[in-house]
Amino acid sequence: MPALATGSACDMGLYELLAALPAQLQPHVDSQEDLTFLWDVFGEKSLHSLVKIHEKLHCYEKQNPLPILHGAAALADDLTEELQNKLPNSEIRELLKLLSKPNVKALLSVHDTVAQKSYDPVLPPVPDDIDDEEDSVKIIRLVKNSEPLGATIKKDEQTGAITVARIMRGGAADRSGLIHVGDELREVNGIPVEDKRPEEIIKILSQSKGAITFKIIPSTKEETPSKEGKIFIKALFDYDPKEDKAIPCKEAGLSFRKGDILQIMSQDDVTWWQAKHEGDANPRAGLIPSKHFQERRLALRRPEIVVQPLKLSNTKSSGFRRSFRLSRKNKKINKSMYECKKSEQYDTADVPTYEEVTPYRRQIHDKYRLIVLVGPVGVGLNELKRKLLMSDAQHYGVIVPHTTRARRSQESDGVEYIFISKHLFETDVQINKFIEYGEYKNNYYGTSIDSVRSVLAKNKVCLLDVQPHTVKHLRTLEFKPYVIFIKPPSIERLRETRKNAKIISSRDDQGTAKPFTEEDFQEMIKSAQIMESQYGHLFDKIIINDDLTVAFNELKTTFDKLETDTHWVPVSWLHS
């Protein structure tokens, strides 16, 4: 029999190709995690051993050592019988002795087996009474690094079987395409799991490094391929899976903060969606509560929560005349503003969970987005607006409020106020022309929708400050508002920075400016906390007005980016 060839020629080929592949693929791999996965796969010792065997067999195959005959053992038997009929001599006796040795007989038998290619195992015949529906078993071997497997398991309460509950998108199990929801788990690395709890199996998986071998019974249920496009949502609440008692696997949960943009990877489960942070290079998804499930949980908790309303001051509202801070006591807020049906398709003020969003970038021909400023009395909204107008009066504009009071001698119609009759004001209220309105000393004051449109029509950025409960009615396709919450600093900083400042006190009948009091500071902090707690999910940005110049510069930078950069907006604004 010809010997196996040796030399460098047989050490080339597939083995060296596998060794060089990771370096060759590096420029084409998107993430470091994928590259690490490739290094782990191609660096497996068992894979290298198989490749070496393949190379040796390949070199042997090239020599094409065809057998001279396929029955060497039978030929030896015939020769022995023939020689026994001959007159014996020393050579015949030596040959008969050699052919009778067990080692020689075994060698000839192996030769015939290889020559006849009859070395494949012979399977036993299929029993006649076999059950056609008997479960088939599949052996799966996955190679993973330190990342989680990316699958959750559960125990069937009726059968006691351990099954795959879900496959996390982008995880090792998902990328392999070998494990599916509903598969029954029988063994992990040779360890039977029929009598184990899911927690014990998870511990086995977490302790396994490198390759993991599964013995499973495939699910008979066919999976429907997901046809979902890219869906992005804005989180309207904070979430920490470690504090969620309902989540099936805390390690598989995805934490997020209010305002984060998430990409939905799967909505197959009505209770738990799979998502990842937008822009995250990590392909693995995590579990988050679905919109329906979160709304239901919040609705069930609502009777136990005491929501503290914004404290209403008396009819002598501070800063009322110039900033249109309507009387908190007698103020009536328009509940059905123009186009509010569109904005209420997603009523975030009731149960804030998620809002579907899409990227938006203002085009040159588009009107500017409405800038809505929200903040407690005394925080500095008017001063910030004044500085913005002074910085560029041609670019920024403010609305002129309507009133039914008599015009004073030093006032001009359309400058300080738009003066209209009480009958016309009430008519406009009935046809939903006011964003918000109220009554002060038997006179009506209000901010009309037409005033906002008038500023935007002049190709200016409209600066509008309103009460926070009005914001949701402004969130329409027409205005595309960008809401900024001006937040006060700590009360210690207020005492330091506002000790010489003045406020129009609500306790002064004349509405004259007086120095801040300790009560004013406390009221400002308390109002800001309530605003952020109840309406924070509607705010696009929060700016702390600790130093007026710093706050103004941050505000100005925000506006500049708003006009040029891409931002996330409700999908209804672009697809209405």
UniProtKB/Swiss-Prot annotation:
Residues 368-560 form the Guanylate kinase-like domain. GO terms for biological process: bicellular tight junction assembly; positive regulation of protein-containing complex assembly; protein localization to adherens junction. It is found in: Membrane; Lateral cell membrane; Cell junction, Tight junction; Cell junction, Adherens junction. Pfam families: Guanylate_kin, L27, PDZ, SH3_2. CDD domains: GMPK, PDZ_MPP3-MPP4-MPP7-like, SH3_MPP7. Residues 228-298 form the SH3 domain. SUPFAM superfamilies: L27 domain, P-loop containing nucleoside triphosphate hydrolases, PDZ domain-like, SH3-domain. The keyword Amino-acid biosynthesis does not apply. InterPro entries: GK/Ca_channel_bsu (IPR008145), Guanylate_kin-like_dom (IPR008144), Guanylate_kinase_CS (IPR020590), L27_C (IPR014775), L27_dom (IPR004172), L27_dom_sf (IPR036892), MAGUK (IPR050716), MPP7_SH3 (IPR035599). GO terms for cellular component: adherens junction; bicellular tight junction; cell cortex; lateral plasma membrane; MPP7-DLG1-LIN7 complex. One of its GO terms (molecular function) is molecular adaptor activity. Its main location: membrane. Residues 289-383 are annotated as: Phospho-regulated basic and hydrophobic (PRBH) motif. Belongs to the MAGUK family. The phospho-regulated basic and hydrophobic (PRBH) motif is sufficient and important for interaction with phospholipids permitting cortical localization. Phosphorylation of the PRBH motif by aPKC inhibits the association of the protein with the cortical membrane. Acts as an important adapter that promotes epithelial cell polarity and tight junction formation via its interaction with DLG1. Involved in the assembly of protein complexes at sites of cell-cell contact. This is MAGUK p55 subfamily member 7.
